Amino acid sequence: MSSNFEANNNNNGEKQLVCVTGAGGFIGSWVVKELLIRGYHVRGTARDPADSKNAHLLELEGADERLSLCRADVLDAASLRAAFSGCHGVFHVASPVSNDPDLVPVAVEGTRNVINAAADMGVRRVVFTSSYGAVHMNPNRSPDAVLDETCWSDYEFCKQTDNLYCCAKMMAEMTATEEAAKRGLELAVVVPSMTMGPMLQQTLNFSTNHVARYLMGTKKSYPNAVAAYVDVRDVARAHVLVYERPEARGRYLCIGTVLHRAELLRMLRELFPRYPATAKCEDDGKPMAKPYKFSNQRLKDLGLEFTPLRKSLNEAVLCMQQKGHLPLIYPVPKRAYL
């Protein structure tokens, strides 16, 4: 991270109160950790703050003095207003990963509630967590086109292919942008891709479970497909970075690399050769898919440096071993991941 970013954080973060929705999730937990490191006072929302699944947040450095958890639901506007009271900024991270048909209207209503509650309580700046599912799902995009902040997924294509999570993130992001403009809120949108790296929470999330299933060979084959990846710590830093830069508005594509699933599996096998990792590619009769071009320049221009995927995968697996989600079938190297 650049020295300018460090200085920015140290000067602006001290004593400021911000709220993080979905604080106990994979990304939300790292956003909370990053904010605490930077000196912020943090209020995290959860449906049940006393639930043991949120206990890891209270163990973070600085949590005793500067972290509080409160009960809030994105579908309950009154609970959001209470959570945002006295806050300078809001990080709207909360978002389930599913293909539930009800996800789209719930995501839209929840996002509208968050933006309006923030405006009602005098919050000036909101950072919204979108997804590259709102950006890259477009079958008509040229193979030579560069994926950047101007790109949007094709809603009808996502709907027809049952990618309802992508539909939900598209509509939620559009809602956030429209509502923020109406209410005069400053809005920055972080658009992360498949997020890798170590967990702070105890339970597996979508992407860590994805890695575990491939490493254990539970998935018998992998698709002839490419995907975009980014480290969860880079995603958290991106959130804080765009929050702290007054000029940062609009979308910020948060992608570290794009590669074929075969390359991901090759990395896993090289790092952890004793696991029975998935080795067979699904035969779809098509040539091997090629990685697409992308631009993460907007975040690089703000000082963000991206973590190599190999490091993210290594530390994700070590973390899952330490938390008991993967068997220890060979001596684990002593490496810190936090």
From Swiss-Prot:
Class of the enzyme per the UniProt entry, highest EC level:
oxidoreductase
Q: Which UniProt keywords apply?
A: Cytoplasm, Disulfide bond, Lignin biosynthesis, NADP, Oxidoreductase, Plant defense
UniProt cross-references to CDD domains, sorted A to Z: FR_SDR_e
- From the Swiss-Prot or TrEMBL record, state where the protein is found: Cytoplasm
Annotated metabolic or biological route of this protein: Aromatic compound metabolism; phenylpropanoid biosynthesis
Annotated protein name in UniProt? Cinnamoyl-CoA reductase 1
Identify the taxonomic lineage of the organism of origin: Eukaryota, Viridiplantae, Streptophyta, Embryophyta, Tracheophyta
Disulfide cysteine pairs (residue numbers): C158-C166
Q: Name one Pfam family in it.
A: Epimerase
- Family classification: Belongs to the NAD(P)-dependent epimerase/dehydratase family. Dihydroflavonol-4-reductase subfamily.
